[in-house]
Amino acid sequence: MSTRYHQAASDSYLELLKEATKRDLNLSDEDGMTPTLLAAYHGNLEALEIICSRGGDPDRCDIWGNTPLHFAASNGHAHCVSFLVNFGANIFALDNDLQTPLDAAASREQNECVALLDKAATAQNIMNPKKVTRLKEQAQKNARRQIKECERLQEKHQNKMAHTYSKEESGTLSSSKGTFSRSSPSNASAPGTFGSLSKGIKDTFKIKFKKNKDTAEQVGKEGRSGQRNVMEVFREEEEDSFSGDFKEKLQLSAEEDGSVHHESILNRPGLGSIVFRRNRISSPEDISDSKREFGFKLPSELLQRQGASEADEGAADEEGEENGLKDDLPWDDDEVEWEEDVVDATPLEVFLLSQHLEEFLPIFKREQIDLEALLLCSDEDLQSIQMQLGPRKKVLNAINRRKQVLQQPGQLVDTSL
C-alpha cells in the first residue's frame, strides 16, 4: 500500500525520509512501487541517496520488472543513473520484456544515459568478467520469476473481476426472484379474491346487458308506434313541479334585488373616520348651492380669488413634497453612474499603482507575469524580458520593500476615531 514515505520520495521531502526504516523504504504499493523506485522515476537524487543509505534496495523492481535503473535511464535522469551504477545496482537487470536499462534508455533516445550505462558495462566486463556472467544469470532468473508473478497477479485480478461480475449478476437475479417470491403470498388469497371479482364482473355485465336490452326494446316500440308527441315528452306532474320551482326562484331573485343596498366606496372596514382632502376646485354650481344652504351671499370676485389661492397652495404643496423627497436623497441622480461592467483590478495592477509603476503593466501582461511571479523574478529575469536598467531597479526596489513589510508587518494598535 502507498504510505507517506512513497509520497515523500515522489516530492523529495528529505526530513521525513530521514526517519524511515529499511522496512518502510522497501514496502511496495499496489503497483509494486517502492520509495526507491519513485525517487528514481522522478529523478530526485537527494531523496535517492538518503533512501539507499538507509537500506533501500536499488535492485527491487515493480510488477513489470522495472528497476530504479530502468526508470532513471528511460526518463533521462543521468545523475540518478550515475549514482545507482556507483552504488552497485545491477546494470544487466531485465524487465518483463527482457530489456536492460541500456535498452530502455536507447528506446527513449536518452543518449547521455546510454553512454553512461555502456561505459559502466564495458568497465565491469574488463575488470571482472565472472561477476558479469553471474549478474546476467541472476538477472535472467529474476526475470523468469517476475514474469510468472506478473501472470499470477493478472490471473488473480481477472478471476476477481469475473467473480465480482457474476456476483452482481446473481444479485440481480436473486433480487428479481425475491420480488416474485414476495408477491406469491398475496397470490395465495387470489382464488377467493378472483372469485368475488369475477362474480362482480359477471353481475355487472348482466345488469348492463339487461339495461341495454330494455333500452333496445323501448326504442323498438317507439319506432313501431312512430314519432312521439310533444306533450308526451314531459309529464303533467313534471310540468307543474317545474313551473312551481321556476316561479319560486323568480320571486326569491326579485326579493334579493330589492334588498341589495350598494354601500359607499368609503364605507370600508378599517378606514374609520378618515377625512379625505378634496384636491379639486369647487364648481360654480357647488358654490351657488352652498350660498343657498347657508343663506348668505359672497362676492364673486372673492370666491375667484379664494379658488385661485387654493389652487396655488395645492400646486405649492405638491412641488414642496417633490423637492423634499429630492432633498432627502443622499445622492445626486445626475451624478449616479452604474459600475456593473467595471472589472476589479488585479493584485499586480494594485501593486504597480501603489508604487507609481503602472507604465510597466503592459510589459508584464505581455509576458503573462502576475504578482506572485513578479516577486520571484530576479534582475536577470527582468533583463531577459528586455526591460531597461532604470525600470528594473524601480521594480526590484518595490519588490524588496514589499518583502520587508511582509516580513516585519509591525504591531497592530488601535486608532482614535
Curated annotation (Swiss-Prot):
- Residue ranges annotated as compositionally biased, kind Polar residues, are 171-190
List the Gene3D superfamilies.
Ankyrin repeat-containing domain, Transcription Factor, Ets-1
Q: What name does UniProt use for this protein? A: Ankyrin repeat and SAM domain-containing protein 4B
SUPFAM superfamilies for the chain = Ankyrin repeat (SSF48403), SAM/Pointed domain (SSF47769)
Q: Sum up the protein's function in the record's words.
A: As part of the intermicrovillar adhesion complex/IMAC plays a role in epithelial brush border differentiation, controlling microvilli organization and length. Plays a role in assembly of the complex. May play a role in cellular response to endoplasmic reticulum stress.
Q: Where is this region: Mediates interaction with MYO7B?
A: 253-346
Q: Which residues form the SAM domain?
A: 351-403
Query: Which PROSITE patterns did the record assign?
Result: ANK_REP_REGION, ANK_REPEAT
PDZ-binding, short sequence motif: residues:
415-417
Q: Where is the composition biased (Acidic residues)?
A: 310-322
Effect ascribed to mutating residue 48 to P: Decreased localization to microvilli
Give the sites modified to Phosphoserine.
Answer: 283
Impact of mutating residue 417 to R? Decreased interaction with USH1C
The organism named in the record is Homo sapiens
| Any one GO CC term of the record | plasma membrane
Annotated compartments? Cell projection, Microvillus
Q: Which domain of life is it from?
A: Eukaryota
Q: Which cysteines are joined by disulfide bonds?
A: none
